[in-house]
Amino acid sequence: MMKTNSTLFNSVFEMSLRIMLLLSVNGNKYYSAEQITFLDFINCYSEDYDLPFANLHGTNNQKLAELANRRSLTYESIKSLVTKGLIDVEIQNGYRFAISNLGIKYVKSLESDYAKEYKTIALSAIRKYEEESNKSLLDVTSFILSKRGK
């Protein structure tokens, strides 16, 4: 029987890859950890946010609980990415993060269909939601989850 490695899913490693993919689509733009969390969530459940893509992570009735877990994963992943030099930090307006040159080089090596689709959706999600405040993103997410009964 083949044994799967479930530690790859919902892990710092997986979240780190998604953060780098997300940050790579908008060049040197800096985002807060909360913005990264919400944009990643929107990216994975894009259909629920009326973006013209299917949900990358399928249907999930526990999205609100997943969002809470995703926040802590985002912070752990950011720490790991910063220490490895894969993302840069700016502290002028609170802690904000952008992909580094090393991170861009790493992302260019990711050629899977998932990586390509994630980046396509990320560009659309960023265009639609990047100017929203953290509170506004939370309000939109809460509304969408309650509207969908999830």
Regions picked out by a protein language model, each given a short descriptive name:
Residues 89-113:
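Accessory beta->alpha helical hairpin/"wing" motif in late/C-terminal subdomains of nucleic-acid enzymes
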Residues 2-59, 63:
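Short, amphipathic alpha-helical interface elements at domain boundaries
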